[in-house]
From Swiss-Prot:
GO terms for molecular function: ATP binding; NEDD8 activating enzyme activity. Its EC number is 6.2.1.64. InterPro entries: E2-binding, ThiF/MoeB/HesA, ThiF_NAD_FAD-bd, Ub_act_enz_dom_a_sf, Uba3_N, Ubiquitin-activating_enz, UBQ-activ_enz_E1_Cys_AS. Signal peptide: none annotated. It comes from Caenorhabditis elegans. Catalytic subunit of the dimeric rfl-1 (uba-3)-ula-1 E1 enzyme. E1 activates NEDD8 by first adenylating its C-terminal glycine residue with ATP, thereafter linking this residue to the side chain of the catalytic cysteine, yielding a NEDD8-uba-3 thioester and free AMP. E1 finally transfers NEDD8 to the catalytic cysteine of ubc-12. Required for cytokinesis and mitotic spindle orientation during early embryogenesis. Belongs to the ubiquitin-activating E1 family. UBA3 subfamily. It comes from the Eukaryota. Expressed in intestine, vulva epithelium and head and tail neurons. This is NEDD8-activating enzyme E1 catalytic subunit. GO terms for cellular component: cytoplasm; nucleus. It catalyses: ATP + [NEDD8 protein] + [E1 NEDD8-activating enzyme]-L-cysteine = AMP + diphosphate + [E1 NEDD8-activating enzyme]-S-[NEDD8 protein]-yl-L-cysteine.
């Protein structure tokens, strides 16, 4: 029920002006009244990520009237976080981001219950995500976005006529920032464009938050970036000269140490080409960009929970390089998307092309890391410490022509840690 406590009523006066009054921007079924604020306070909402964007989101949601919030993040607090992730203090360094952020918000906003989960999003199953009415992502990783996107699509049930059941849809609000640019979008799984529908919007990631590369590296790029921004300044090699990404001796020094760090965390893929590419570009996090995008995401959550206004349709761009500028565009759903539309993807390959060339194409198109390819009768490529028996055959297959591996029309199953579900390709030898 809505609180009758005079102090609580005064605290939410501004929000009640939106929920208790009529509006020209309302959705057609909106009816002014106290029930809207009650619905807001009873909405269960999940925030994924408690970093720069996540801290802003938690603060905004709690101060907007949401009372049941959960936050999930696998990272711990690093000293580099303290300049912009304002829910953390120096004494919190080394502690769980999710747990510290949840405790801070609960202490400052009376009546707001924030539950922390210090784990990977992949550690939670369907029953966990199904209990939420809205999920907001404040992630710095494309694979993580794709995973939760696939999970929410899987939660949508079909009715007898094959159409998605609207009652099983959990809206996803996704926010992202990079330097002075950011975006926010609202996704209705299987109804509007999902993350994979617009995967071309995301270039290969080359900019990484320091907290990630220092504490929980997950990509080869994380290892290289760590050597660049942490190890080089500390060790001051070559008599303390500045790192020159065009100097092959400097690049080799970084490559050797990045390879050792990658080996420590069981990460593959550190090579000279990638090292050179990462060394030449880094964009710092900007607190004001996080604030703007988090505010936009929180506003969309407020609209979804109360129906006081229509959500954006459906992708907001923001930039503050030369003044502040925003625009909203409507992303179209891809009817051939393997995640939200289902089905099998026809994939043309040359009969004389090799399996290695196919893997490169798939990795670039779908942002894969270490894909495994298999037909219904055999594994074509699988490099895994859990299945060493396939390694030699996989290496031999890399240089084998596709016509010698599969027949025209045969299906290949592609799995990868970046995917929440396997891709099914119908090979067309042309």
């Amino acid at each position: 029920m809505v609180s009758v406590d005079p102090l609580a009523t005064e605290r939410w006066r501004s929000i009640r002006r939106l929920t208790d009054r009529d509006s020209a921007y309302k959705v057609p079924w909106f009816v002014p009244g106290p029930e809207n604020f009650e619905a807001l306070q009873n909405t269960k909402i999940l925030v994924i990520g408690a970093g720069g964007l996540g801290c802003e989101l938690l603060k905004n949601l709690a101060l907007s009237g949401f009372r049941t919030i959960e936050v999930i993040d696998m990272d711990t607090i690093d000293v580099s976080n303290l300049n912009r992730q304002f829910l953390f203090r120096e004494s919190d360094v080394g502690k769980s981001k999710a747990e510290v952020a949840a405790a801070f918000v609960q202490q400052r906003v009376v009546g707001c219950q924030v539950t922390a989960h210090n784990c990977r999003i992949e550690d939670k199953g369907q029953e966990f995500y199904r209990k939420f009415s809205i999920i907001i992502c404040g992630l710095d990783s494309i694979p993580a976005r794709r995973w939760i996107n696939g999970m929410l699509c899987d939660l949508v049930l079909e009715m007898a006529d094959g159409k998605p059941d609207e009652n099983t849809i959990i809206p996803m609000i996704d926010g992202g920032t990079e330097g002075f640019k950011g975006n926010a979008r609202v996704i209705y799984p299987k109804f509007t464009a999902c993350i994979d529908c617009t995967l071309d919007l995301y270039p290969p990631q080359v900019n990484f938050p320091l907290c990630t590369i220092a504490h929980t590296p997950r990509l080869p790029e994380h290892c290289i970036e760590y050597i660049k921004v942490v190890v080089w300044p500390e060790e001051k090699p070559f008599e303390g000269v500045s790192l020159d990404a065009d100097d092959p001796i400097h690049v080799e020094w970084v490559l050797e140490r990045a390879s050792l760090r990658a080996e420590k965390y069981n990460i593959r893929g550190v090579d000279r080409r990638l090292t050179s590419g990462v060394l030449k570009r880094i964009i710092p996090a900007v607190a004001s960009t996080n604030a703007v995008i988090a505010a936009s995401c929180a506003l969309e959550a407020l609209k979804l929970a109360t129906n006081i206004a229509k959500p954006i349709d459906n992708y907001l761009n923001f930039t503050q390089i030369h003044g502040a500028y925003t625009s909203v565009v409507s992303m179209m759903k891809d009817d051939n998307c393997l995640t939200c539309s289902g089905g099998r993807l026809p994939f043309e390959v040359s009969p004389s092309s090799t399996l290695e060339s196919l893997i490169i194409r798939l990795s670039e198109r779908f942002h894969l890391k270490h894909p495994t390819l298999a037909t219904s009768t055999r594994k074509l490529y699988c490099i895994s410490s859990f299945m060493p028996q396939f390694e030699q055959e996989s290496k031999e297959n890399l240089h084998t022509s596709m016509k010698d591996l599969v027949s025209d029309g045969e299906e290949i199953l592609v799995s990868d840690e970046a995917l929440s579900r396997a891709l099914t390709l119908r090979i067309q030898l042309i």
